[in-house]
Structures are given as C-alpha cells and as structure tokens.
C-alpha cells in the first residue's frame, strides 16, 4: 500500500505445501520437513503457526493448552520440546503437522516457538492475543462497581485499541485518506500482480440533536477489506458519536475529490 509512491505498508508471507515437524532422535528435537507440492494454499490462520495441544506433564484429564495468539493454527504444541500430537497423546516419534504460512522475513526454524507471530492477512479474533490484553481487567472490583448499574461498562484499564482487529503490521500510521494505491502480488497464478487505487471521497455527517442543534463532522476512511474470492474491495468510513449529545438523526453527504488533493469540498451531495 502506497500514497504518491511513498510506501505505507509492505507485507510478504511465504506459503508452502504441507510439511511436518519430524522427530530427530539423534538431536532429540524436531525439524521441519521439506514441503510437499501444492497447487494452491488457502490463506487461513489454521495453516499459520499456532494451535493447541496437551502438555505431557499435565494430568490425563487436564484440558488442552492453546497458543494465545492463534489457537486454531498448526505447528505449536504444549509442553516440552518433543511435544504431543493435538487431540491425542501420540508417540514422540510421530510426525507433527507444521505451519504452511509464515512471515517471509521470519521463517520458523524451531518447534514450540512461543514468540513466533502468526502469519496472515485476516482480522485478529477478539479473544486472541495481543488483542485480548487490551480488553482490560474484569474482576470482583469491576463487578462491585457495576453492581447497581443498569449496564456493564468497560474496565477502567480498557484500551480502545481493542477495537482494532487488523494485524499490527497492517495498520497505517496516521490513517487512510483515499487515493492510496493497493498492490497485490503472488495471490493468483493467472494474475501475478493486481493493482487498484482507492477512491478519494469526502464523506461528511450532519448530526442533529434532540434540542435542534446541528453538528457537521467529516468521516474517516478507516477500513479496507479485500475479498479475494469475489475480487472486491470494501471500504468503511466511520464516525464515533458521543451518547451525551443525544443525536436523533444523521444525514450523510459525499463528494469525490481530485486525486492527491486534500481539504473539504465546497458543496455536498446527500447520500442518506
């Protein structure tokens, strides 16, 4: 992603065919096998590093442990370096499924790497780390504070970054404005390189309060969602309203701006 030839985001993933962590008895550790041939690899977190498994030191009735940053992934196992196969207590010597998607600048070289970043382009689930850590602390003190309240509010240490579901390396510093150039490479054999330019739109919200006051606020382009199955790019402009303002109606206006030109347009066209 770039703006006027200035790079904003540059992310490269490496995809392989199926591969396994093979047990090397002479070294008492696992190493990744060579990948098998593959015509296509789905871009899914299930194929990125992560997963769940049993710790050999746990009681037989213990619940499985999960990789906090990607519980549905492949290649991670709980406990000692030799690990156990997810869903069963298989022999150490059995091959263990490895990840097929990794960061090009940080290939996996060892098993059970707790700090390895799950590789993907999709949103991060709210109950995955590091997003979950931003949700705050919900303990007995929090429950007591809201005991007589009509609704439960966020914790005092809640961080609004919790609402950001994009991977950290896909967040544009300073935000988007439109007119950025989007380039995708290597996703399709039939179209090795794809390029699109985001529209430069000014969208403004006219908010009317219950007391008859009006307030005009520019909306921000804050989300770009790429649907590779449908070959569509979805854009979201967002506005946050203060509940205390008692907003009863919102009208939206938009106008296309020349590429590379900032500032508000002189006239608006209503769209809602």
Language-model region placement:
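Extended intrinsically disordered or low-complexity segments
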Residues: 1-272
């Amino acid at each position: 992603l770039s703006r006027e030839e200035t790079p904003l985001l540059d992310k490269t993933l490496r995809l392989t065919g199926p591969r396994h962590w093979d047990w090397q008895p002479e070294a008492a550790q696992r190493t990744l096998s060579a990948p098998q041939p593959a015509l296509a690899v789905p871009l899914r977190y299930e194929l990125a590093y992560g997963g769940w498994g049993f710790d050999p030191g746990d009681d037989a009735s213990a619940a499985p442990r999960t990789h906090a940053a990607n519980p549905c992934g492949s290649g991670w196992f709980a406990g000692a370096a030799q690990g156990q196969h997810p869903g069963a207590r298989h022999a150490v010597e059995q091959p263990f499924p490895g990840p097929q998607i990794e960061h090009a600048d940080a290939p996996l070289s060892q098993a059970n790497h707790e700090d390895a970043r799950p590789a993907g382009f999709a949103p991060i689930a709210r109950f995955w780390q590091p997003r979950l850590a931003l949700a705050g602390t919900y303990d007995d003190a929090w429950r007591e504070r809201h005991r007589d309240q009509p609704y439960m509010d966020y914790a005092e240490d809640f961080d609004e970054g919790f609402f950001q579901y994009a991977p950290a390396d896909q967040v544009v510093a300073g935000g988007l404005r439109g007119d950025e150039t989007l380039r995708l490479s290597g996703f399709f054999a039939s179209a090795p390189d794809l390029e699109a330019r985001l529209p430069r739109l000014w969208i403004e919200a006219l908010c009317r309060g219950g007391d008859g006051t009006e307030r005009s606020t520019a909306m921000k382009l804050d989300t770009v969602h790429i649907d590779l199955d449908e070959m569509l790019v979805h854009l979201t402009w967002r506005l946050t309203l203060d509940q205390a303002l008692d907003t009863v109606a919102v009208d939206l206006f938009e106008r296309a701006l020349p590429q590379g030109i900032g500032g508000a347009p002189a006239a608006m066209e209503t769209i809602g």
